[in-house]
Amino acid sequence: QTFEFNKDNVKEPDIKEAKKIAEYLASHPNIASKRWVYEQYDSMVGTKNMSTNRPSDAGIANVKGTNNAIAMTCDCNSRYVYSDPFVGTQIAVSEAARNIVCSGGDPLAVTNCLNFGNPYNENTYWQFVKAIEGMSSACRKFNTPVTGGNVSFYNQAVMNGKTEAVYPSPVIGMVGTVDKSKQMTLDFKTQGATIYMLGEIVDDINCSEYLYSYRGVKLSPAP
């Protein structure tokens, strides 16, 4: 059912609707800034946080007395995993690795928190198995051993008289090391700097918030 999706059947927005879509997505809870939550925490406690004034794609913790810091990130898009557990979990590991690398670090190792529904449900157990296989495949690619983690089953609720499981969520936690002199930050460094887009650019809206929430298309392949 998922792979019967055809993007050509999705309405192409005009300029007027495009503005409406942009406003809708910018205010959506899954996209809107969470700054009002995390800025309430005193991030300077212990003076180890190197990301407070110089934000990176990963959190950076200073290792005092050395030239190194620790980069940390957590990533998962459960919609990708629901669509394709193997590929979706590969994407989660890949995103974590990118966050470490784009912060100036080298990925070292992975932990995880695997959240699924009832394992006695055949589809749920299949999702679980394929997610582990996807994680294993990606971790071997990045040479990041899984040092530990936990599994949480029976994440479900009764909705309209029917038991519904959460979307499968294999959350990936990754750590890496950063040479403090090479920490990368999010901001552009100089006016007029050249910006490069790396990799192949494809016309892909699969599993997007736009498709899922705005257009109401709940099933589409993972990107």
Where are these regions (language model features)?
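Glycine/proline-enriched, intrinsically flexible loops and inter-domain linkers
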Residues: Q1-P223
